[in-house]
Curated annotation (Swiss-Prot):
Domain Era-type G: start-end pairs: 8-176
Name this polypeptide is given: GTPase Era
Family per similarity comment: Belongs to the TRAFAC class TrmE-Era-EngA-EngB-Septin-like GTPase superfamily. Era GTPase family.
Keywords associated with the record: Cell inner membrane, Cell membrane, Cytoplasm, GTP-binding, Membrane, Nucleotide-binding, Ribosome biogenesis, RNA-binding, rRNA-binding
Record has rRNA-binding as a keyword: yes
Region (G5): 155-157
CDD domains to which the protein is assigned, alphabetical: Era (cd04163), KH-II_Era (cd22534)
Length: 300
């Protein structure tokens, strides 16, 4: 007797401009926080896999940096190259757009995804915020005209609206394959990477308008000792002024950053965490390809 539900497994790229809700979408699909989020553009810098196994279906989501026009620094080039590379060798592409707003960077992404030959889904995000759903129809029709071969689906990444339907549509397009990852694995990234990203998220959320984008985080120690996980994180900035901003008056800001990051780490790693933060000035790191490679930014 044959199984009527074949085993399916494949890769799903989530692409779009910065700050459109890609990482929020991934987190909601996975049912837990994996990708960092903030209201600031370019929060995501690396491609990261989020793996969801449900019964016979394993969907391997590739969360990508937002495609953007700035290409002047090595870090910007790295992020754009990562996002474009995700369109290759995947089985499904999800193009996340806003319910009403359309920018030059959305157009940039559209020009890339129009060459996708496989299944393409346009996920129109934040539709829960519209009082009159009928107002959405012209935008959906316009998107369909731009990409006639795509499926257009209204969603809310934040509230989870219509995500079950989105996942069902994705599953239909995944090829028949054995699963590539164990059922309980949710990402390809190391615990060190996830810890560094959590610190960076708290920095972005704490700094607001003062945010210096030339910030990265390096984990210097990650060691379990008994029931306590000891993490030492180095925050790199490019100027002394940025260092002062992060530390804050009498060290209050860096204390808040550390406290918020530690809380999330304890949930993620299911352990008591002792987190120590330092801030160091490394001038020009975001435009230094050798420095970026040493900090884990891969090929540039």
């Amino acid at each position: 007797m044959t199984d009527s539900n074949p085993t399916r497994c494949g890769y799903v790229a989530i692409v779009g401009r910065p700050n459109v809700g890609k990482s929020t979408l991934l987190n909601h699909i996975l049912g837990q926080k994996l990708a960092i989020t903030s209201r600031k553009p370019q929060t995501t810098r690396h491609n990261m896999l989020g793996i969801k196994t449900e019964g016979d279906v394993q969907a391997i989501y590739v969360d990508t940096p937002g495609m953007h026009k700035a290409n002047d620094k090595a870090l910007n080039r790295y992020m754009n190259r990562n996002a474009s590379a995700a369109l290759k060798d995947v089985d499904v592409v999800i193009f996340v757009v806003d319910r009403t707003k359309w920018t030059d960077e959305d157009q940039l992404v559209l020009e890339r995804v129009q060459y996708v030959t496989g299944p393409l889904i346009i996920a129109v995000n934040k539709t829960d915020r519209m009082e009159e759903k009928a107002e959405l129809i012209p935008h959906l029709q316009w998107l369909q005209e731009q990409l006639p071969n795509a499926e257009v689906m209204p969603i809310s990444a934040q509230q989870g609206h219509n995500l079950e339907a989105l996942e069902a549509q994705i599953a239909k397009h995944l090829p028949e394959n054995d699963h590539f990852f164990p059922e309980d694995q949710i990402t390809d990234r190391s615990s060190r990477f996830l810890a560094a990203e959590l610190v960076r998220e708290k920095i972005m959320r704490q700094l607001g308008a003062e945010l210096p984008y030339q910030i990265t985080v390096e984990i210097e120690e990650f060691k379990q000792q008994g029931h306590v996980l000891h993490i030492h994180a180095l925050i790199l900035v490019e100027r002394d002024g940025q260092k002062k901003i992060i530390i804050g008056d009498k060290g209050e800001r860096i204390k808040r950053i550390g406290s918020e990051a530690r809380k999330d780490m304890e949930v993620l790693f299911d352990s008591k965490v002792m987190l120590n933060l330092w801030v160091k000035v490394k001038g020009g790191w975001s435009d230094d390809e050798r420095a970026l490679r040493s900090l884990g930014y891969g090929d540039l």
